[in-house]
């Protein structure tokens, strides 16, 4: 008996018992079993390998050599990986290993989401969970606080299995006899061995890690390997709906095959939770397999105590078939993977013929959508009353929170209803109601209330954009009693499901993807030999040269200018654009002083009723500019936005200059404008772009050219960009704020007069003209002011602007600052 006893560490490795004698056949040489180590040609008759007789090899080198040979044998011969061989191990090391084996606890978890708690759920925790479920519903945070010893993720994971088991069993209560009838009890009368073997077992083990990976477990399921036999045995017949899977192997030997099946022997006792008993619910209650109906097959080899259990009973096979039909997330075993007297041959066949893509078979939770019938008529809601259905659907406002009160819920709900009355029958999106609900809660909270009102038909009734299908969680238990309660419960679940992120699965190549992306695909499963043969055939084939024209450097030019399209009767302007004289003056001033592109923000307002965008102010910004492109400095952009907000304006657009070429957007400008439009449209706002060209060589007039544009959804014929459309701009008949324009002019002059791209304002701006750059600027400003004020005030203001420029640029010339390069650019 002493020679047969062996200790199993948490990796499944076999260590000779401390009581074994050196001459009893349990020496180190006997551990090298013939079927689990190298081919016979690699060793001598007595089983020893020649290199093991060399005493000069250190223990470290010996271990490295063993590992290399094991890996070579595993990958080349496709045999099962053997147990780790412990050579010349000291007795104190063995005792230390034995102590670790008896106290070790492992948690089996999904490799993508490691759980942080390995203790099984106690009866008290389960009772507290049920109390919290009855009191708080599916509020996992509150239930976690009630339990105290479990995190929110652990409570959620336990609840998933709890509801799943209730759905499988069909009844909330089940007698202990019914529960124990789902387990198969295997007894060895000679040694008193008992093993409760669940009919749904399939495991995978990694020999290099102290964790046993179980396929088809949920993310937070746990497996404990412990020696607490009495405690587990006492709790087995009691209520046990936990998702924890507990394995107990005290002082036993465990062989594990390459595919992950466990072959146990000696005195071992394995207890499993009832998470796997759901696949036996179709069996009769009194159908219990006795120990006489199951034969225990034991094989003893001369050099070791290797035992296997063969389950040959016909009823057991039928139960296995029933389990294979089960589609839950339990642990599933195939009948073809049961242990047999020749485990290595079975492993080889499985290696050659089977490729498991559990993730492709929808191991992850399915995200099916449950259709909700669209409301038949629009619902009128009393603005002063909160119905019970609203409290069930949006419970966060009725839990006594300081920030989320029923009064705040009324404010949000009634504001959304008011906005719907204004924009009816146009679709009311979530972002359009956010500006009027500042300091009323986060975006998701407002979105959930909007979704609830849309689902019940209070808003967006009859709109095509209204969506009545929401992703639904899998583990939801349906309430069948009251129809109204069912509808409210389902609605609440849809709203809660919006908080959870979409689960992903792995494709056959190991890449993360959406589960729906794998639907309708067929994968070809090839063995290693077939795959290698196909690769050799592909190498032998001549490579066909694809005659694809090489793209030239100019095939895609981000600075290519795209002419704007014009709105017509077929495609009308989405809104009108009106620009104040103050904004035109500042844009002209800013664009004239630099031969590099300048940039800034436009502030104003948008009237939804009149469909008019009013550009009231222009705020210059610092630019991160090169000779070819211009981007807005983030810090300066933030400051400009705050300046416009102080004046009561919203950011409704941006402007930049094309100093000496046409005011048409480049491909880069189109991309930038499209991104701005997409961002601001989420809140229901409008966003325009303006381009100022002061020194365009193709423009015979001294006035600047200005283009106001938006980017449409239409795609160009070659599919490389979206089409820009140009607005007809109207000037607003309001006098500018003279002092503000003068201060902006002073800031612009101080910033650009010493820059390398500064324009010499006293030089001729073009060869065929007598006007200097400053005189040209004054002509542009005079034209703008002629429509909003009398000529005397305009001339007085222009004189002050001219004196400001002359004083600054005269001092520059005295300091020796020349602008020859910019002059050449202007004259060209």
From Swiss-Prot:
Keyword field contains Magnesium: no
Coiled-coil positions: none
Cross-link (Glycyl lysine isopeptide (Lys-Gly) (interchain with G-Cter in SUMO2)): 187
Domain MPN as annotated: residue spans: 577-709
Domain SANT: 116-167
Sequence motif: JAMM motif, positions: 656-669
Region described as Disordered: 1-31
Motif LXXLL motif, chain ranges: 774-778
Top-level taxon of the source organism: Eukaryota
Keyword Ribonucleoprotein listed: no
All copies of domain SWIRM, residue ranges: 372-470
GO biological process, one term: regulation of cell migration
GO molecular function, one term: histone H2A deubiquitinase activity
Record-listed Phosphoserine modification sites: 110, 218, 242, 267, 340
Annotated binding of Zn(2+), by residue: 656, 658, 669
A Pfam family of this chain: JAB
CDD domains: MPN_2A_DUB, SANT
Family (UniProt): Belongs to the peptidase M67A family. MYSM1 subfamily.
Disease per UniProt entry: Bone marrow failure syndrome 4: A form of bone marrow failure syndrome, a heterogeneous group of life-threatening disorders characterized by hematopoietic defects in association with a range of variable extra-hematopoietic manifestations. BMFS4 is characterized by early-onset anemia, leukopenia, decreased B cells, and developmental aberrations including facial dysmorphism, mild skeletal anomalies, and neurodevelopmental delay. BMFS4 inheritance is autosomal recessive.
Protein's UniProt name: Deubiquitinase MYSM1
Lineage: Eukaryota, Metazoa, Chordata, Craniata, Vertebrata
Encoding gene per record: MYSM1
């Amino acid at each position: 008996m002493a020679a047969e006893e062996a200790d199993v560490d948490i990796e499944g490795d076999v260590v000779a018992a401390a009581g074994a004698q050196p001459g009893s056949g349990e020496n180190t040489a006997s551990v090298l079993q013939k079927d689990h180590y190298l081919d016979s040609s690699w060793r001598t008759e007595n089983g020893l390998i020649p290199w093991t007789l060399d005493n000069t090899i250190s223990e470290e080198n010996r271990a490295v050599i063993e590992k290399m040979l094991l890996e070579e044998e595993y990958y080349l011969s496709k045999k099962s990986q053997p147990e780790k061989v412990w050579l010349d191990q000291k007795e104190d090391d063995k005792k230390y290993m034995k102590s670790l084996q008896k106290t070790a606890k492992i948690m089996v978890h999904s490799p993508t989401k490691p759980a942080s708690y390995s203790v099984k759920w106690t009866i008290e925790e389960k009772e507290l969970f049920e109390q919290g479920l009855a009191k708080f519903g599916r509020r996992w945070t509150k239930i976690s606080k009630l339990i105290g010893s479990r995190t929110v993720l652990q409570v959620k994971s336990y609840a998933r299995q709890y509801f799943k088991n209730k759905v499988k069993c069909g009844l909330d209560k089940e007698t202990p006899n019914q529960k124990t009838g789902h387990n198969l009890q295997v007894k060895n009368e000679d040694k008193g061995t008992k093993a409760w073997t669940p009919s749904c077992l399939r495991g995978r083990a990694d020999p290099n890690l102290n964790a046993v990976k179980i396929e088809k477990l949920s993310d937070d399921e746990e497996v404990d390997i412990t020696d607490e036999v009495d405690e587990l045995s006492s709790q087995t017949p009691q209520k046990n709906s936990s998702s924890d899977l507990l394995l107990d192997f005290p002082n036993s030997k465990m062989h594990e095959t390459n595919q992950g099946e466990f072959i146990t022997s000696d005195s071992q006792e394995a207890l499993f939770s009832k998470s796997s008993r759901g696949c036996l619910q179709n069996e009769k209650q009194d159908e219990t397999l006795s120990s006489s109906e199951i034969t225990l097959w034991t094989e003893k080899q001369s050099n070791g105590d290797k035992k296997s259990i063969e389950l040959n009973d016909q009823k057991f096979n039928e139960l296995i078939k029933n389990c294979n039909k089960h589609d839950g997330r339990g642990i599933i075993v195939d009948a073809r993977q049961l242990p047999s007297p020749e485990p290595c041959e079975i492993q080889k066949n499985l290696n050659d013929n089977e490729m498991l893509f559990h993730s492709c078979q929808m191991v992850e939770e399915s995200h099916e959508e449950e259709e909700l019938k669209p409301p038949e008529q629009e619902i009128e809601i009393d603005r002063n009353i909160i119905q019970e259905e609203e409290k069930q659907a949006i419970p966060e406002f009725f839990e006594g929170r300081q920030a989320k009160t029923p009064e705040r819920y009324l404010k949000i709900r009634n504001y959304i209803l008011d906005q719907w009355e204004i924009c009816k029958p146009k679709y009311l999106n979530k972002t359009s109601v956010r500006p009027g609900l500042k300091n009323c809660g986060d975006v998701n909270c407002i979105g959930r209330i909007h979704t609830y009102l849309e689902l019940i038909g209070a808003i967006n009734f009859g709109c095509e954009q209204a969506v009545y299908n929401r992703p639904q969680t899998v583990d939801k238990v349906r309430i069948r009693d009251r129809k109204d309660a069912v509808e409210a419960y389902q609605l609440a679940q849809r709203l809660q499901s919006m908080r959870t992120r979409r689960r992903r699965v792995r494709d056959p190549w190991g890449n993360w993807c959406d589960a729906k992306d794998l639907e309708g695909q067929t994968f070809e499963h090839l063995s290693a030999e077939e795959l290698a043969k196909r690769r050799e055939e592909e190498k032998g084939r001549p490579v066909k040269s694809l005659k694809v024209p090489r793209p030239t450097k100019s095939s895609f030019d981000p600075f290519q200018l795209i002419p704007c399209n014009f709105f017509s009767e077929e495609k009308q302007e989405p809104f009108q654009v009106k620009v104040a004289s103050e904004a035109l003056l500042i844009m002209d001033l800013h664009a004239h002083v630099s031969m590099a592109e300048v940039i800034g923000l436009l502030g104003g307002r948008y009237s939804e009723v009149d469909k008019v965008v009013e550009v009231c102010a222009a705020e210059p910004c610092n630019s991160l500019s090169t000779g070819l492109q211009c981007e807005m400095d983030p810090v300066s952009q933030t400051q400009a936005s705050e300046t416009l907000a102080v004046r009561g304006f919203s950011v409704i657009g941006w402007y930049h200059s094309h100093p000496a070429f046409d005011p048409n957007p480049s491909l880069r400008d189109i991309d930038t404008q499209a991104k701005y439009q997409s961002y601001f449209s989420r809140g229901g706002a409008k966003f325009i772009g303006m381009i100022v060209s002061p020194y365009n060589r193709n423009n015979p007039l001294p006035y600047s050219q200005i283009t106001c544009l938006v980017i449409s959804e239409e795609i160009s014929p070659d599919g490389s960009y979206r089409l820009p459309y140009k607005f007809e701009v109207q000037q607003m008949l309001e006098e500018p704020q003279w002092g503000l324009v003068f201060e902006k002019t002073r800031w612009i002059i101080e910033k650009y007069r010493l820059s390398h791209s500064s324009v010499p304002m006293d030089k001729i701006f073009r060869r065929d003209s007598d006007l200097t750059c400053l005189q040209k600027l004054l002509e542009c400003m005079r034209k703008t002011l002629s429509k909003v004020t009398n000529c005397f005030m305009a001339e007085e203001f222009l004189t002050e602007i001219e004196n400001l420029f002359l004083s600054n640029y005269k001092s520059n010339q005295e300091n020796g600052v020349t602008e020859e390069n910019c002059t050449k650019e202007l004259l060209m």
